[in-house]
Amino acid sequence: MGLPWYRVHTVVLNDPGRLLSVHIMHTALVAGWAGSMALYELAVFDPSDPVLDPMWRQGMFVIPFMTRLGITNSWGGWSITGGTITNPGIWSYEGVAGAHIVFSGLCFLAAIWHWVYWDLEIFCDERTGKPSLDLPKIFGIHLFLSGVACFGFGAFHVTGLYGPGIWVSDPYGLTGKVQPVNPAWGVEGFDPFVPGGIASHHIAAGTLGILAGLFHLSVRPPQRLYKGLRMGNIETVLSSSIAAVFFAAFVVAGTMWYGSATTPIELFGPTRYQWDQGYFQQEIYRRVSAGLAENQSLSEAWSKIPEKLAFYDYIGNNPAKGGLFRAGSMDNGDGIAVGWLGHPIFRDKDGRELFVRRMPTFFETFPVVLVDGDGIVRADVPFRRAESKYSVEQVGVTVEFYGGELNGVSYSDPATVKKYARRAQLGEIFELDRATLKSDGVFRSSPRGWFTFGHASFALLFFFGHIWHGARTLFRDVFAGIDPDLDAQVEFGAFQKLGDPTTRRQVV
């Protein structure tokens, strides 16, 4: 037929059997990729340290999605929350991966069957004997079935009525686990960080989908609407389907980047806004202040800060610090976190406590500035030593660590103080192993960043696809060259351009 590459899909335009076949094959490819990717990730994933080397630091992409739906155990004998297990059951990570691969194989065979046996009676219009699809009826069937699936997920899987529940955690990502969730029917259900909204919205949307599906199955569209929206044209289906997909992609790009109950930080890593707003830093200081109010020493109060909470308060876990073209996991960037060194508290020679100004997200380098409790600059690491007034040496800055591995250790040597001041710009200070993975020291993004970039990019492309195919189906007659005001009988093949008498073909 000699079709150019960008028009090859026209071969299934008027062939319902093979149109179905290629869609089944597409499902086979997607399910096959998901299962294979899961097995690959499980092969390289190290579950030994869920606190300092969680899945998102290791660049896992499909494991977090399985985990948020209730999968936590592996046939390898480990659990995502740490520790060992003896009976993971069939629905382990490997079980889900295997199910996708088996499903992919079945879809592959079904696609071949439908390609070979394309001329089925079900696709034939009994009035004309030609292949035809009742698209409004098919729309009703799909709407009804997707409504049933949506309702079932919300009413059974999420609530734990028949299923494990979903991943639920506290606002600081410390106590996450899989548990049943009750639907939130009040106004709180509209809070994107309330897990109950996931159950209630799926139940509500599923109910609406079931009712809408039944409506479209029992009520035919008016003729004027049918013709106006080109409901008999398969390209209308393509256009509206692309619209649904790009809209969903934009929504999930937002819920991933800004955070929500569907994207827990324990599975996907913190958001950039938690660094920008000092979210974890405030909670750490609140806990320390509460400890001091209970007559604990500084050392005791800081020692009670969970290492997991301190690790979130480190700029290397900010997904906006990775460049778009820096491949690899976060561990390939700044290294594998080994331990928290503790919280450094800086003081000048007058005993004033100094705070290192933290690096904003979009800076690669930032001046080291130490301010007092009133925000007045008291010390810095100068660019030009000759003009310095506030250098660490001149001000006599010392540093002492509280909590962590260096608890109780203090330094007054200016070179060492400056080293830790530079590191304090980046949040809490951790010992990082850069040798194991040959990490290059350049920050990487987390799966949260990759997911957002991918879905936002494809949503934009699909938006243009929706406009393109929508215009093609709505203005098909215009693009074909038919004058809408043409009253004369048009004979196909009489003219080179349809309906244009100036291009009459010569009879040979």
Curated annotation (Swiss-Prot):
Q: Which GO terms describe its cellular component?
A: chloroplast thylakoid membrane; photosystem II
| NCBIfam families linked | PS_II_CP47
Q: Does the keyword Nucleotide-binding apply?
A: no
Classification from the root reads: Eukaryota, Viridiplantae, Streptophyta, Embryophyta, Tracheophyta
What protein name does the entry list? Answer: Photosystem II CP47 reaction center protein
The question of whether Plastid is a record keyword is answered with: yes
Q: What is this entry's stated membrane topology?
A: Multi-pass membrane protein
Q: Where is the signal peptide?
A: none
> Which Gene Ontology molecular-function terms are recorded?
chlorophyll binding; electron transporter, transferring electrons within the cyclic electron transport pathway of photosynthesis activity
In terms of InterPro entries, this protein maps to: PS_antenna-like, PS_II_antenna-like_sf, PSII_PsbB
Provide the cofactor note recorded for this chain's UniProt entry.
Binds multiple chlorophylls. PSII binds additional chlorophylls, carotenoids and specific lipids.
HAMAP family per the record?
A: PSII_PsbB_CP47 (MF_01495)
Principal localization reads: plastid
